[in-house]
């Protein structure tokens, strides 16, 4: 006969298990919609890549760089500083999966719905701005230190973006969700 504590830990009445199941199901649904509908049948993905390219171009030009942009193909565009090879920006670079990851956590974690309505878009906007700054930095690295581009693309900036998202989650749990949970426990 299984241990009662073990069974209680893995029952659907356990708040953590509910959160994991809700978040997992929601992420799977969003992933499938993105992969099999949005990416295939809409121009949303390409438009978002274009928005990142244009925003990166504005930031680099504001910093005094001469830039170039190339439409590589339907799913890939290049932005760079004149004299460099530039950086490719594709559907894996547009941060939509990061928006989903962040959003799923906020939606699935208990908290005041009113707080979720402003925190979710604010967090997504912050992740988007950070992603644009990531592409700006990668373009600068491709120009000045191209030998470090792959490492920074694969490790440094992935680490920074995921830590930023983790920080947004911690802020949510400590400042908003806990407040909501504590109020529920007092009533």
Question: Residues of each region from the PLM?
Answer:
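Hydrophobic N-terminal alpha-helices or hydrophobic patches in metabolic proteins across all domains
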Residues: 1-187
């Amino acid at each position: 006969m299984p241990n009662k504590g073990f069974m209680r830990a893995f029952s659907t009445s356990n708040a953590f298990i509910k959160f994991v199941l809700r978040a997992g199901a929601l992420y799977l649904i969003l992933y499938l919609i993105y992969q099999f509908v949005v990416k295939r049948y809409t121009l949303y993905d390409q438009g978002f890549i274009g928005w990142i390219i244009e925003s990166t171009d504005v930031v680099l030009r504001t910093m005094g760089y001469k830039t170039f942009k190339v439409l590589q193909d339907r799913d890939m565009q290049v932005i760079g500083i004149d004299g460099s090879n530039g950086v490719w920006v594709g559907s894996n670079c547009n941060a939509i999966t990061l928006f989903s990851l962040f959003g799923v956590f906020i939606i699935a974690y208990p908290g005041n719905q009113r707080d979720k309505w402003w925190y979710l878009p604010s967090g997504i906007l912050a992740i988007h701005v950070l992603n644009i700054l990531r592409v700006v930095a990668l373009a600068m690295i491709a120009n000045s230190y191209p030998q470090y581009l792959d490492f920074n693309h694969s490790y440094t900036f992935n680490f920074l973006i995921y830590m930023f998202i983790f920080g947004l989650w911690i802020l949510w749990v400590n400042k908003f969700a806990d407040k909501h949970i504590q109020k529920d426990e007092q009533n």
